[in-house]
Amino acid sequence: MKNDEVKKSIIKATIEIIEKSDGDINKITARKIADKSGVALGLINYHFGSKENLIAECSREIINEKLFGLAPDKVDYMADDGLSDLERLISFARQTFDYIYSNPSIAKISIISDFKDYDPAGNSSLTQKGFQMALRGDISERKKKLIAFSLASIMQTAFLAGDNSELIIGYSLKSKEQRDIFISDVVTMLMNAITPVA
C-alpha cells in the first residue's frame, strides 16, 4: 500500500472503532486499529504521531462530514432570514445539540479530545465560529467570540454530565423538549448578559 492508502485505511478503521466505542476512549486501542486496518502497529505512530492524534483527526473528520454537512437552514448564512440574533443563535445551537445527542460516542470523544488539546482548527473552535455567524447585530467581535465560547463550553459540559444533567443543571437533556428549553434559556442568559436590554 502507498502512504496515502495506508493513512486512509487507518482513518477508516479508526472511525469504525470510534463509532462502536460508546464514547469510551479506552476501547480504542492502537492494536485494534492496526488489526482492523491491516497495517503494522508502528505505522499508526509514523503517520499520526500517536493514537490520540489519530483519534482527534478522525473525530474532526467525522464532525466536519456530518455536522457541517447539515449546517443550519441555508447556503448563504449572511442572507436576511428575518430572525433576530437571539432566535438565530438558538436555532444554530439547537441543531448542534441535537447532533451531539444523536452521535454521543463521537461527540464525547471529540469534546474530550478538544479539552485535552484546544486547537483553533478543532471541532470546538469551529463550532464557536459557526455560533459567531449567527450574531449579525451591533455586537463587537470580542463579545461575539465570548458568547460563542461560553455557549459551546456550556453545551459541552452539560452533555458530558450525561444522566446526571437533571441533578446538576436542572434539565433532563436526553429529552429533546428539555434540550430545547435549556438552549433557549442559556442563549437568552448569555445574550442578556453581554448585550443587556435597555
Regions found by a protein language model. Name each.
Residues 58-88, 125, 132:
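Amphipathic alpha-helical linker/stalk segments
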Residues 67-72, 108-146, 180-184:
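Amphipathic alpha-helical packing segments from all-alpha helical-bundle domains
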Residues 131-141, 154-198:
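C-terminal peripheral helix-coil segments that are non-catalytic and often amphipathic
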Residues 9, 20-53, 57:
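Helix-turn-helix
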Residues 94-121, 162-167:
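Amphipathic alpha-helical segments used for helix-helix packing
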Residues 9, 53, 91, 109, ...:
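Amphipathic alpha-helical interaction segments
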